[in-house]
């Protein structure tokens, strides 16, 4: 698998974020597994070790369908063991379908799908907790891709105590405010106060 194995391992991050809302991770697994099966059949991907190429995504889909009702009802959640397992299974299915390029493209698509499914909750989180006002879809995407303790650790290592001020409209649209949000910066409050995009209606429109 080579470099593709890194992408497969990185699938764990967005699936972790998806699993923080009941039903979100299950929806992502069902949608992406079904798409992978369909694409594999249409393209006619060759069997791997005499096993049909659609076997991995089909097994992933069937397993998730059996579990999903309890997840949607909020009675249980995948947890780290569950969402990590589904993440790796999806990644392997992506690799079988399209190699490195296919894995990269579907990794991005999966991250975007999670950002879309969780858009309301993520927007509330960015506004209330990180004070990123009027968050763009790029901010949501970057939160799914780099949010959590591991992402913050890398920010601390790379940025130290610096907090980058992002005021370019293109970079804001691409989510660079979330990407460079450094919770370890002593200048964070001053940077937030300078955000010219602050709107009092941000919270009300999400209710």
Placement of each model-derived feature along the sequence:
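Alpha-helical transmembrane segments
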Residues: 2-16, 20-207
């Amino acid at each position: 698998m080579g470099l593709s194995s890194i992408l497969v391992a990185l699938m764990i991050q967005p699936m972790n974020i998806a699993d923080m809302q009941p039903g979100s991770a299950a929806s992502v697994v069902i949608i992406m597994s079904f798409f992978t099966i369909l694409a594999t059949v249409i393209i006619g991907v060759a069997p791997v070790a005499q096993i049909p190429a659609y076997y991995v995504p089909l097994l992933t889909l069937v397993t998730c369908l059996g579990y999903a009702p309890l997840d949607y009802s909020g009675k249980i959640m995948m947890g780290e063991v569950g969402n990590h397992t589904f993440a790796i299974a999806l990644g392997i299915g992506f690799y079988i379908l399209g190699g490195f390029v296919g894995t990269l493209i579907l990794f991005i698509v999966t991250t975007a799908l999670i950002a879309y499914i969780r858009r309301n909750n993520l927007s509330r989180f960015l506004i209330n907790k990180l004070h990123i006002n009027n968050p763009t879809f790029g901010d949501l995407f970057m939160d799914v891709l780099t949010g959590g303790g591991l992402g913050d650790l890398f920010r601390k290592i790379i940025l130290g105590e610096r907090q980058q001020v992002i005021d370019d409209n293109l970079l804001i649209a691409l989510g660079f405010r979330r990407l460079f949000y450094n919770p370890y910066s002593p200048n964070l409050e001053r940077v937030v106060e300078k955000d010219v995009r602050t709107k009092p209606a941000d919270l009300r429109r999400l209710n």
